[in-house]
A protein has these predicted regions:
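ER/secretory pathway lumenal C-terminal domains and tails of membrane proteins involved
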Residues: 1-296
């Protein structure tokens, strides 16, 4: 009920997608309670939103989103929109922060047909993450000798992964054109972090970014990203091949097969967008590596 739980003799299955969401919601009852909440001056630009106030928004945002999703499931898009709007009206993004808690609302906006609002929220969150990433990225580039990477590594990982996740959610929805500029921004400002991640780990998580670049007409950038990812996989394949004679050859063969699967996935992506000669050349090189491993 609102912000509290009531113990009732009803068994509710655990939500496998989010096991932290306990119990069930009676949306109309909760709606009546939520509409009676007194927010004070929460949306005012003239007050200081102290850390505890902002921290309390975690529960409010989470529960309001749950309520909105229940209305969406019931097909009541009008009330779902009302709750979503209430959330951002009373807890403006700029004042309450904890940006990751607002990310699920993008999907909710899409579900109720509010495309423009969904994409506006995406852009607002993107700016928050990208501002942080730019600070660390430019600091590393301009003050390489004195920038204390170890002191900020956790923040770098956090904002990079949040930004990447934000982009991947749009890719899963098929919004390739819309998100293409964001992909270019991501690569431009985070590529310097590959020294922190390790080049292989940095690039391998960008496989899903290749196709949107091609589809949006950024063929040169798409090929460049393909090459960077492919070179990391090929290097890993060569390393595994050189170690095949070790006693743990079965394990190495399994690792090799996994990397080959990743390489073939890359080829399937570019096949639809690259000229035949380029694709054939890449395919032959991969087949040669595979044959050398088998015959060794």
């Amino acid at each position: 009920d609102g912000l509290v739980y009531k113990l009732v003799p009803i068994k509710t299955p655990i939500n496998e997608e989010n096991p932290y969401q306990m119990g069930r919601i009676e949306p109309n009852r909760m709606y009546d309670i939520v509409k009676k909440w007194e927010w004070g001056n929460s949306e005012s630009p003239n007050i200081y939103h102290d850390p505890e106030t902002r921290k309390n928004s975690i529960s409010f945002r989470g529960n309001l989103h749950r309520l909105a999703e229940e209305f969406i499931k019931d097909g009541n898009y009008e009330k779902a929109k009302e709750i979503i709007e209430l959330n951002f009206e009373k807890m403006p993004l700029n004042y309450f922060e904890y940006y990751s808690l607002s990310e699920p609302y993008i999907s909710s906006y899409y579900k109720i047909g509010e495309l423009e609002k969904a994409q506006t929220l995406f852009k607002n969150l993107e700016k928050k993450y990208l501002d942080q990433i730019k600070y660390y990225s430019l600091s590393m580039r301009n003050y390489e000798d004195i920038f204390p990477i170890s002191d900020f590594a956790e923040n770098i990982f956090t904002y990079t992964e949040r930004y990447r996740g934000l982009i991947e959610d749009e890719i899963l929805l098929g919004n390739y054109i819309f998100v293409s500029e964001s992909i270019l921004n991501f690569i431009n400002y985070t590529e310097i972090f590959k020294n922190i991640y390790g080049s292989y780990d940095y690039y391998i998580f960008l496989i899903n970014f290749i196709e949107p670049l091609y589809i949006s007409g950024n063929n040169e950038e798409g090929r460049k990203l393909y090459k960077n990812i492919s070179s990391q996989i090929k290097s890993r394949l060569e390393t595994l091949m050189s170690a095949k004679e070790d006693s743990n050859s079965v394990y190495l063969s399994e690792l090799f097969e996994d990397e080959m699967n990743s390489a073939n996935s890359l080829l399937r992506i570019i096949k639809n967008y690259e000229i035949d000669d380029y694709y054939d050349s890449e395919n032959r090189e991969l087949m040669k590596i595979n044959q050398n491993f088998i015959s060794k």
